[in-house]
Swiss-Prot record:
Name under which the protein is recorded: Trimethylamine monooxygenase
Organism whose genome encodes this protein: Roseovarius sp. (strain 217)
Positions bound to FAD: 14, 39, 41, 47-48, 64, 74, 127, 317, 320
PANTHER family: DIMETHYLANILINE MONOOXYGENASE
UniProt KW Transport keyword: no
Function: Catalyzes the oxidation of trimethylamine (TMA) to produce trimethylamine N-oxide (TMAO). In vitro, has a broad substrate specificity, oxidizing many nitrogen- and sulfur-containing compounds, including dimethylamine (DMA), dimethylsulfide (DMS) and dimethylsulfoxide (DMSO).
Length: 445
């Protein structure tokens, strides 16, 4: 009998979780399908694979990365720790709770290096088109260095390309004549560019909070945040203000809905991202808002209208790496015949039920527990190592409280690992004073 062939699109955290899931089954003696992972970048890690580039890459492809220098985790690492590969195992000791970008990339890479899955990835290979042909998928890709296009046949396709790389870019009158710089968070790379400048941030997402904090930390003159519905409401520094929605820009002056104005040197649009899958035809393409209960995905992963197609990591996220693991193990077991999918009507009812339950939640705490329950639900159906999901939810709740108490100091707190039970040490330098975010300096605890 011919082995099934599986195409994984993307080698970021969710794609790497899927590779690890299959490798885990093989390590236990199971016969796994033939796996091919296509990755547009020349290295794994997805968004965590930092690049200085913006706009287009060396091959004329849209730059995938939205990562910037000096980024530190904006949530405790205890909420994302791999159940099968702890921070202590990787670093040989417990580390502080809010690692910088380079530290988290090192951790992500460590697990897949140990698993030995790099040979399953075709790097610098962009997926151009996926179409259903009978009971198979034809996947057309381009090897970018050679500009060579070819098509291969697969039994299943797993989309792991993420949803934080195609920016949502609104227009405001006057942008075309603004004398400063207008950019989306996707193209933000270095807070030092905005030293001694008055910056305007449009949006109240996590990127607004974090990019504003970065610019404050590295010496911008002032931060003004424009909100559409409500301010973030934290206890910001004196040179930080929140105002209603931007209406227009004239010269260097920004005009807001309440009639106030502010002269600014730069506008940073922290206005979110789009689920964007240009390689998929309309009947296979996921169309969903950024929410916990995604549209058209049974158990949050199986595409209802074509259940041989899966999407990983498409939810809005409290949980990240460990949720991708839970999803990847579950998808693996469906493909390997360990879990049977129900009929389409049952899957559609599941989607509706998840949306209804999410909508019934009244606040962020309800959302945290909602997603925690989802992670537990998937883990209970596979052999993924169980871990203290409730403890992770409690860490997220503490994190929310720490941010409310001190938005510029919340990263100075420590939490207990839900995998090993070890308490994280306090970092050797308060976040606002830690200007060197290198791996070597961070690990000097």
């Amino acid at each position: 009998m011919t082995k099934k062939r599986i195409a994984i699109i993307g080698a970021g955290p969710s794609g790497l979780a899927q590779l690890r899931a299959f490798q885990s089954a093989a390590a236990k003696g199971a016969e796994i399908p033939e796996i091919v992972c296509f990755e547009k970048q020349d290295n794994w890690g997805g968004l965590w694979n930092y690049t200085w580039r913006t706009g287009l890459d060396q091959y004329g492809e849209p730059v995938h990365g939205s990562m910037y220098r000096y980024l530190w985790s904006n949530g405790p690492k205890e909420g994302l720790e791999f159940a099968d590969y702890s921070f202590e195992e990787h670093f040989g000791k417990q580390i502080a709770s809010y690692p910088p970008r380079a530290v988290l990339f090192d951790y992500i890479e460590g697990r897949v290096l140990k698993a030995g899955v790099r040979n399953l990835i075709r790097f610098s290979t962009a997926v151009r088109w996926v179409e259903k042909a009978g009971d198979k998928f034809n996947v057309t890709v381009c090897h970018l260095p050679e500009d060579r296009t070819y098509t291969e046949e697969f039994d299943h396709v797993i989309v792991c390309s993420g949803h934080f790389s195609t920016p949502n870019v609104p227009y405001f009158p006057g942008f075309e004549n603004f004398k400063g710089r207008v950019l989306h968070a996707h193209d933000f790379r270095d807070a030092l560019e905005f030293k001694d400048k008055d910056i305007l941030i449009v949006g109240t997402s996590y990127s607004a909070e974090d990019i504003g904090s970065q610019c404050w930390k590295y010496g911008c003159k002032s931060v003004t945040v424009s909100h559409r519905t409500a301010p973030m409401g934290f206890n910001w520094p004196d040179n930080w203000q929140e105002v209603p929605l931007l209406q227009k820009v004239e010269g260097n002056t920004a005009y807001f809905k309440d009639g106030t104005t502010k002269d600014v040197d730069a506008v940073i649009l922290c206005t979110g991202y789009k689920h964007h899958f240009p390689f998929l035809p309309d009947d296979l393409r996921l169309k969903t808002a950024n929410r916990l209960a995604t549209a058209d995905l049974y158990k949050g992963v199986a595409f209802v209208r074509e259940p041989a197609l899966f999407y990983l990591g498409m939810q809005d996220q409290w949980f990240t790496f460990n949720m991708f693991d839970a999803q990847a193990w579950w998808v693996r077991d469906v493909i390997m015949g360990r879990i049977a999918l129900p009929d389409q009507a049952t899957m559609e009812a599941d989607v509706i039920d998840r949306v209804t339950r999410e909508d019934a939640g009244e606040d962020d705490y309800a959302a945290i527990w909602y997603q925690g329950d989802y992670v537990k639900e998937l883990i209970d159906e596979t052999d993924y190592p169980s871990f203290d999901v409730e403890g992770a939810c409690k860490a997220f709740k503490e994190w929310k409280g720490h941010k409310k108490k001190d938005i510029m100091g919340f990263r100075n707190n420590a939490y207990k690992s839900v995998i090993t039970g070890t308490m994280a040490p306090m970092h050797h330098t308060p976040w606002k004073d830690a200007l060197d975010d290198s791996l070597e300096v961070y690990l000097q605890n």
